[in-house]
């Protein structure tokens, strides 16, 4: 069943504010297998192990950890896990940034990418390479405000857009934050890198729990 998808199609990468300087210094987000060791992790350790083994069946291939991951929605189940203290990271959601771009911007830049119809570690996840195949995703599930049940709804909400090896900072269009305090800190960090692209910084509490 084909479904209408938003065009442009926003994509969202979440990261801790402590990682922002490193991203700006390098001028890009790096895939886990390309990353320097001093990144502040907000992920489940056991899921990271699975991502390092989960093979990507579409070109350019490799494993999930060879890609920079994005969701198709803010306020993801992963952010809820952070908010509720379910991950090894215990710093809460306030320091978490949403870095926003679009699938079309990635395509226009000629970057290798794939995307999935649900959480990428699942054995029954389907992988796609063509933007028109975004219509294969369950956009009602992706945009759902309540996703705890049934389990398949949660799986589909966590569909992923995966960019091979690195994602240029120049393609980030917005940095969404939880609070004015974090927004001001982001602006201070951006000022330290005057040659880098300056995305808009927006307080979006409705993207958080």
UniProtKB/Swiss-Prot annotation:
Domain DarT span(s) in chain numbering: 9-209
Xref: PROSITE patterns: DART
GO molecular function, a single term: nucleotidyltransferase activity
NAD(+)-binding element, as annotated region: 35-53
EC code(s) of this entry: 2.4.2.-
Annotation: DNA-binding region: 44-50, 75-80, 145-148, 154-158
The reaction(s) this protein catalyses: a thymidine in DNA + NAD(+) = an N-(ADP-alpha-D-ribosyl)-thymidine in DNA + nicotinamide + H(+)
Sequence positions that bind NAD(+): 13-15, 22, 30, 51
Family indicated by similarity: Belongs to the DarT ADP-ribosyltransferase family.
The name this protein goes by in its record: DNA ADP-ribosyl transferase
